[in-house]
UniProtKB/Swiss-Prot annotation:
This is Retron Ec48 transmembrane protein. Keywords: Antiviral defense, Cell inner membrane, Cell membrane, Membrane, Transmembrane, Transmembrane helix. It comes from Escherichia coli. The chain crosses the membrane at residues 11-31, 64-84. The N-terminal transmembrane region is required for protection against bacteriophage infection. Its main location: membrane. The keyword Metal-binding does not apply. It is found in: Cell inner membrane. One of its GO terms (cellular component) is plasma membrane.
Length: 235
């Protein structure tokens, strides 16, 4: 900001100096051409009026220059004010972003310790946060549509497995289900490995509950799905 003020002073100073030089040259030529130097020096009203008439062009230049400088300084001042405001907003957004991200990370980390089947190194909090709040650095902490769609796809993976369960047939192709669940969870930074059916179901149960806990705390949207309430016929 100091650099902008220095630039303003420099422009005004240089412009004023150039205009002063131009005015002095114009005044000198006017005196020469009108032979004003041959007249006696006097300061009565008639003399001053006569001199003003002869140098009226220079006076108009001064008036125009004054108007231009005033306009320029006003416009430049408004620009500096806007830049100051934008810088303040940006700094405030950065501060809010950092605070919100820290709160998210600390809360998610604390909740993760309550779930023994999920390994901490398998959860990327920063990726999860970026998917959930892609515009957070700009001050917008609204939950993204992409994130809500991912949550919806997790539900679809569960329902697809449910569709294979019947009274006669309990086989839901659990390996295919595991691959699909792993793929969709990876989109929000949660990485899990495939494994025996019962162990995977336990891990999946804790993850769904974990996601719900985060969503209930940070997603103020009526459209978010509570995954742990989705019936899973295969458990």
């Amino acid at each position: 900001m100091n650099a902008n003020i220095r630039l303003l002073k420099y422009i005004v100073g240089v412009s004023s100096a150039l205009f002063l030089i131009f005015s002095l040259i114009s005044l000198f030529e006017t005196i020469q051409n009108e032979k004003l130097y041959e007249r006696d020096i006097c300061f009565d009203s008639q003399c001053l009026k006569f001199f003003a008439e002869k140098t009226s062009g220079i006076v108009m230049y001064f008036q125009a220059f004054g108007w231009l400088i005033t306009t320029f300084v006003t416009v430049f001042g408004v620009m500096i004010a806007l830049m100051t405001y934008n810088a303040g907003v940006k700094n405030n957004n950065n501060s809010n972003y950092t605070s919100h991200l820290t709160m998210f990370r600390e809360f998610a980390s604390a909740e993760l310790t309550k779930r023994s089947s999920i390994y901490p190194e398998k959860v990327n909090f920063f990726r999860w946060y970026r998917v959930m709040f892609p515009e957070a650095q700009g001050g917008d902490i609204s939950v993204s549509r992409d994130y809500l769609e991912i949550i919806s796809r997790i539900k679809c993976v569960i329902e697809e497995a449910n569709a294979h369960i019947t009274e006669e047939n309990k086989d839901y192709k659990y390996k295919t289900h595991q691959r699909k669940m792993m793929a969709v969870l990876d989109e929000i930074g949660i990485s899990i490995s495939n494994g025996p059916k019962n162990i995977f179901i336990e891990v999946e149960s804790q993850i769904l509950d974990y996601i719900d806990t985060i969503n209930l705390s940070f997603c103020h949207s009526s459209s978010v799905i509570e995954l742990s309430r989705v019936k899973r016929k295969y458990i």
